[in-house]
């Protein structure tokens, strides 16, 4: 009589799919010091997830980054317009003050 073993094997694709679906957070601190004097501290925070999972947890910085998205370039135009409007408002306020 043969004994059957139920062995599960995962391929790299299966592992990556699970990681991207659920997300993985890696955090660590590296400190270099001599004689109780801290010389260097490196704080590492890494998240590995799919784009959908990242958006789900509120990480969508790449959507508004002008170097990564066309939406981000629009923010630059809005900033310029806002600056121009502030300058116009300041000029108008100064004109009102001088007429008083």
UniProtKB/Swiss-Prot annotation:
Subcellular location: Gas vesicle
MF annotations from Gene Ontology: structural molecule activity
Database matches in PROSITE patterns: GAS_VESICLE_A_1 (PS00234), GAS_VESICLE_A_2 (PS00669)
GO cellular component: gas vesicle; vesicle membrane
Domain of life: Bacteria
Keyword Isomerase: no
Entry annotated with the keyword Protein biosynthesis: no
Signal peptide range in chain numbering: none
Application in biotechnology: The minimal pNL29 gvp locus overexpressed in E.coli can be filled with Xe and used as a contrast agent for ultrasound and magnetic resonance imaging. Engineered gas vesicles (GV) can be used for noninvasive imaging in E.coli and mice. Heterologous GVs with 2 copies of gvpA plus gvpC from D.flosaquae and the gvpR-gvpU operon from this bacterium make GVs suitable for imaging of bacteria deep in mouse tissues (e.g. the gastrointestinal tract), or when expressed in tumor-homing bacteria, can be detected in tumors.
Keywords, comma-separated and alphabetical: Gas vesicle
Function: A minor component of the gas vesicle, might be involved in nucleating gas vesicle formation. This protein could be important for the shape determination of the gas vesicle. Gas vesicles (GV) are hollow, gas filled proteinaceous nanostructures. During planktonic growth they allow positioning of the organism at a favorable depth for light or nutrient acquisition. When a minimal gvp locus (gvpA2-gvpR-gvpN-gvpF-gvpG-gvpL-gvpS-gvpK-gvpJ-gvpT-gvpU, called pNL29) is expressed in E.coli gas vesicles are made.
Family, similarity comment: Belongs to the gas vesicle GvpA family.
Quaternary structure annotation from Swiss-Prot or TrEMBL: Interacts with GvpA.
Protein name: Gas vesicle protein J
């Amino acid at each position: 009589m043969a004994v059957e073993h139920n062995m599960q094997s995962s391929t790299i694709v299966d592992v990556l799919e699970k990681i991207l679906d659920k997300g993985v957070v890696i955090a660590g601190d590296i400190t270099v010091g001599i004689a109780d004097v801290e010389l260097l501290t490196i704080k590492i925070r890494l998240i590995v997830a799919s784009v959908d999972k990242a958006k789900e947890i509120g990480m969508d910085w790449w959507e508004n980054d002008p170097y990564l998205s066309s939406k981000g370039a629009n923010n630059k135009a809005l900033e310029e317009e806002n600056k121009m409007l502030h300058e116009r408002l300041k000029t108008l306020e100064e004109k009102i003050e001088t007429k008083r």
